[in-house]
């Protein structure tokens, strides 16, 4: 049908309607019944057209409908002037064409019912039967819509003045049901009108007319006297019979939604099995998830708004019925996409969380049902289905705001197994973030194990390899999240905390070479924190076999840090070994501390080859070793000798010098008298000075090269001498400092060194200390004659 032709035909029809309406109104004004009927019939004849599209036909119908209101008033006035309503009812039946005749019958019929000269039931039955004469889908649909409209306020019901006998309200019910059935049949038949190439267009036009049919259900829901019993035994079965038998996707989807929306919540709850029983019988193409989601949403709101209704949900076993029905729907629709089936279970889960929030067994049952459905699909590659799974898994998390509650759901991890790698990781991030968002306290090692198992997509790769294309910044953020989680795990019970650390270690070490450098450090420091707590309590409070002993935890850390040396992270491993060695020192575990130093030295020798990294590592070794008090003389000498040996073998001479003079601290500890070897301190400093001399000689040999670096080394050495002088080292003499000072003065005269600010600062410090009267510091500095610096 061409749109321009449609407009022309509509314009012509409207013009004819206006013309006949004008003459009808003139006849009405002159009380000319015969002409009024004549022109009204001619006006109504325009509705016999088959040329208009449903949309245009509706426009024409509304024009006619407005004019029929005037005619109905005229009929009422005629009966008031003595005209017999029965004769009038017979008179209009002489109209020449069936369609105008039936419109006139409906109009006079509504007046007839109001007159009470005959029972409403008889008129309604007569009209609904006579309308069968029009079987053209479009014309018949609008005719019956008009019948429903003009009789809507005239249906007999309990307590109304049109009630009649005791069964009148049942007759009204039968009238509406019958009219609904016939209208739906006509509506469904519209899909077959016209060529098959225009089917999509017809379906769109049909969809625009759906409310004409649906209004009947609204009328049914408003009828007085339709209680739960009548709804259960008569109304719902009749409606569902029509819905199922029409076998039309559009009608089934719309009418099921109408049923859910227009009838009371309690009716749905008490007839749940009947309503749900129809769902598997619907056409496979029906969007069943929309239907069921609407039903569950209404029931959820009903439960939320009425506390008294909650026992009814348990009484009718609403959850079991919904769960069973969804299973049947999924089973009946073999081609149902995975996303659609997951969506169905998502709606059921939301309903369960809303109505039965205290029933974790119900929640877990829904998860289990979803697992059963997904078992036939394997890993989900469909993005839409994966997003639905994430929403499905997020629903209980959002409801309970507690990951520990989620860990009680045995089917939760089984659902996660069906996610692809990226989506599984995204879900793992949601779970871990929930711990921080809700400040969730995880109290046992079993809970930690379950949580880390759920979040394994974040902590390791499914196929054992990591995606090279992953964004480095995103990866760092993800592993920082894991590190934060490890740091958050804390409970007061040391024994259980020890079990947690062992559990975390099991998951962390499986993370792969790229993750370990980011996730092992927080594990190590968490364990060291526990060791400090144990050190503060009674010795071995849990017995020798307990897991919460410093020695056992340090043994675990030794094995853990060793993993880092296997994944090309020797610098980090060395740092952690030294941290563990210090913890062993604090716990007075000499053998364990020595083992950590041995491993650190081995890493230094075999794995750390970069010169800058060696300098940094050696400073850490010296600094840590200086604080160790647990070693006997032999072990300490062995470790100290190795450290000084490493210092002398550094690549750059300035680095050698600095490392050697730092080793002097290994022979002097303020708080331990047996660790004050002044002679060896001075030997280290003199050895460092010899290295500085070599640096100076090389600088002098290179013409045009500044000797800033070598002079600075001398000044640094001078400051070290001053440090040990203040600490009371008797081997540091004024002559030693004098000779070094003269050397500095001599070198600065040869060339502009750039070290003058450093020298001047040192001189000011010496002068300041000489003037101090308290503490005896001035006596120590009297050994230094200031004229050497003039």
Swiss-Prot record:
Coiled coil: none annotated. It holds the Pfam family Vps35. It is a peripheral membrane protein. Keywords: Acetylation, Cytoplasm, Endosome, Golgi apparatus, Membrane, Protein transport, Transport. The keyword Acetylation applies. GO terms for cellular component: cytosol; endosome membrane; Golgi apparatus; intracellular membrane-bounded organelle; membrane; multivesicular body; retromer complex; retromer, cargo-selective complex. It is found in: Cytoplasm; Endosome membrane; Prevacuolar compartment membrane; Golgi apparatus, trans-Golgi network membrane. Signal peptide: none annotated. The modification N-acetylmethionine is found at residue 1. One of its GO terms (biological process) is retrograde transport, endosome to Golgi. Component of the retromer complex which consists of VPS29 (MAG1), VPS26 (VPS26A or VPS26B), VPS35 (VPS35A or VPS35B or VPS35C), VPS5/17 (SNX1 or SNX2A or SNX2B). Component of a retromer subcomplex consisting of VPS29 (MAG1), VPS26 (VPS26A or VPS26B), VPS35 (VPS35A or VPS35B or VPS35C). Belongs to the VPS35 family. Plays a role in vesicular protein sorting. Component of the membrane-associated retromer complex which is essential in endosome-to-Golgi retrograde transport. Also involved in the efficient sorting of seed storage proteins. The VPS29-VPS26-VPS35 subcomplex may be involved in recycling of specific cargos from endosome to the plasma membrane. This is Vacuolar protein sorting-associated protein 35C. It comes from Arabidopsis thaliana (Mouse-ear cress). The lineage of its organism: Eukaryota, Viridiplantae, Streptophyta, Embryophyta, Tracheophyta. The gene is VPS35C.
